[in-house]
A protein has these predicted regions:
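Bacterial Sec signal peptide processing site at the extreme N-terminus
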Residues: 14-34
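Short acidic, glycine/proline-enriched helix-loop-strand junctions
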Residues: 72-73, 102-131
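Sec-dependent bacterial lipoprotein signal peptides
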Residues: 1-17
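Conserved, non-catalytic sequence blocks in retroelement Pol enzymes and Pol-derived host proteins
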Residues: 52-53
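Extracytoplasmic
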Residues: 41, 58-60, 91, 108-112
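Short, cationic low-complexity segments
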Residues: 131-146
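Short, well-ordered alpha-helical segments
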Residues: 58-100
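Post-signal peptide N-terminal segment of mature Sec-exported envelope proteins
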Residues: 27-48
Length: 146
């Protein structure tokens, strides 16, 4: 019995120290598997205003993290994860926005982060062009069937 109580106590302590559970999703706006130029996600440029991006670009996807507590350290940690996800998708930068959800504030998780993954036109390779063309053709077919 004593061993079971200690085990339950340890489980409660471990669970209390676990990371924040968030709700994430990714909405593709272009093909997967684009060429990766940024291998160190810490060097991923982060913009908050479109006017700050000084070269032609297109969004390749949007990544959202919902139900975050209003805690700077947790938000910074999630931004690091967003940058890693953007680099893995072939993005050259992200446009990051933060939203406050009054309804979710009652549960203590009012923050949503939304990041557009940006691909610079100058960074598109020939292989990327083929993937973009194929993606566009598939989108036409999908839209024709709806």
């Amino acid at each position: 019995m004593k061993k079971m109580i200690l085990t339950l106590f340890a489980a409660c302590v471990i669970t209390g120290c676990a990371s924040v559970v968030t709700n994430t999703d990714y909405i593709p706006m272009g093909p997967d598997g684009l060429s990766v130029q940024i291998t160190d996600a810490s060097k991923m440029p982060v913009f908050t205003y479109l006017k700050d991006i000084k070269e032609p670009w297109a969004p390749i996807g949007m990544y959202r993290v919902k139900a975050l507590p209003d805690n700077d350290e947790i938000i910074k940690s999630e931004i690091v994860k967003i940058k890693k996800a953007a680099a893995a998708k072939g993005a050259n930068a992200i446009i990051l926005n933060q939203f406050y959800d009054d309804a979710a504030a009652q549960d203590g998780h009012p923050i949503t982060l939304a990041a557009y993954f940006v691909k610079y036109a100058s960074a598109v390779t020939e292989a990327d062009k083929a993937k973009i063309q194929e993606y566009a053709e598939l989108e036409k077919l999908r839209n024709a069937n709806n």
